[in-house]
Curated annotation (Swiss-Prot):
Family per similarity comment: Belongs to the TRAFAC class TrmE-Era-EngA-EngB-Septin-like GTPase superfamily. EngA (Der) GTPase family.
Signal peptide bounds: none
Residue ranges, annotated region (Disordered): 168-191
Record key words, sorted: GTP-binding, Nucleotide-binding, Repeat, Ribosome biogenesis
Xref: PROSITE patterns: G_ENGA
Record-given protein name: GTPase Der
Subunit structure: Associates with the 50S ribosomal subunit.
Skewed-composition ranges (Acidic residues): 180-191
Positions that bind GTP 2: 222-229, 269-273, 334-337
GO molecular function: ATP hydrolysis activity; GTP binding; ribosome binding
Amino acid sequence: MATPVVALVGRPNVGKSTLFNRLTRTRDALVADFPGLTRDRKYGHAHIAGYDFIVIDTGGIDGTEEGVEEKMAEQSLLAIDEADIVLFLVDARAGLTAADIGIANYLRQRQNKITVVVANKTDGIDADSHCAEFYQLGLGEIEQIAASQGRGVTQLMEQVLAPFAEKMENADENDRTSEEEQDEWEQEFDFDSEEDTALIDDALDEELEEEQDKNIKIAIVGRPNVGKSTLTNRILGEDRVVVFDMPGTTRDSIYIPMERDGQQYTLIDTAGVRKRGKVHLAVEKFSVIKTLQAIQDANVVLLTIDARENISDQDLSLLGFILNAGRSLVIVVNKWDGLDQDVKDRVKSELDRRLDFIDFARVHFISALHGSGVGNLFDSIKEAYACATQKMTTSLLTRILQMATDEHQPPMIGGRRIKLKYAHPGGYNPPIIVVHGNQMDKLPDSYKRYLSNYYRKSLKIIGSPIRLLFQEGSNPFAGRKNKLTPNQLRKRKRLMKFIKKAKR
């Protein structure tokens, strides 16, 4: 199931942005603001009450009963249409207003949406008496919160996301408390034991085989009019495949199975392309929701940039989402044909300057319209996915760590040198390396970057981000009670199950 989408709507100054920041800050999410495209609308990832979801701040709506639809910006309407859940915020202190009534009248027409009235700013007042008049809106119970203090926010999200629990992958992963699983983990595994670390390597090998057996999912993302539709159609046209459109809800992307050179792929279409070989030159409808969900669901992301335009903050925001999601990356510079050589040189110089922090990604200069360079993309796609899922062992990672520290020792802290003991794999896609040692909390960021670059060079990882986790002592999960993500919980359960079986 696609990640649930929660839209925050309401008139100005009712606390939507405060609630948005409260929700997204729970995961230190990268929040993108797309000026011009979405005006003052903000989109972010959030994790609260055990759920992952996307939250939209739709901005203030100054509507009236007669003209609310005219007053709502097009992007606000789109956000409501794309949302699974609409949280309609009202100000408990200010009371019911004509704008609230107008917005409620519009929302009542959206019968297919879960709509919840949320009375904010209930701190320091008799909330029940102040909220009573909001029942006139005819949208059911009134939920009370104080977003600035966080009061009632977790309970609110638990309630509104509950209908999705059975459909979400991690719904049954949190039945046992983190403390119970932490205790079992610490009892079962000794990370100073070669036998146990070898068993973990074997367990991760099983996970790696599962990853490698999958179709490679490719998402083509980028700003409007950079040529996503043209590139999608060119790829499908070149491969002469039958396109199976499998639309879900109005906000779901289209998943198109295809094959090339014996490798199965799934192309995630966020541009709304439906027919192979038919390129529409009209302005593409840009959906941030489709883009974020496609990035999360993909293995490899093709970030498409228009060679005739400068790299924008929107490009960098999309790039931030890709890196934050840990996805493999290929940079595609489209509309390369017909440019003068001096313009090409200037574009390459600009790419080197603005994108120097992702020098691990391959860059392709193509013309989606004419097809030049498109076929070569698949070499980089396969390379990036292979690097993201390559086999790593504890012995190999520890050996590389030793070489790195021999060449450049960690710094002295308080007269004691930071000691890095060993490393082991923590997962794949993206590659995760867990480094154990003493005084890890004092290890400078510059040295962490050095180790990351050293591992990348030694393992020859191209096109994929690499993540290093630094753990004090021998237990990789020490001090992380209640902080594991659902994916980490699932991974740890698989490891425990595998090693218990192997020890019998």
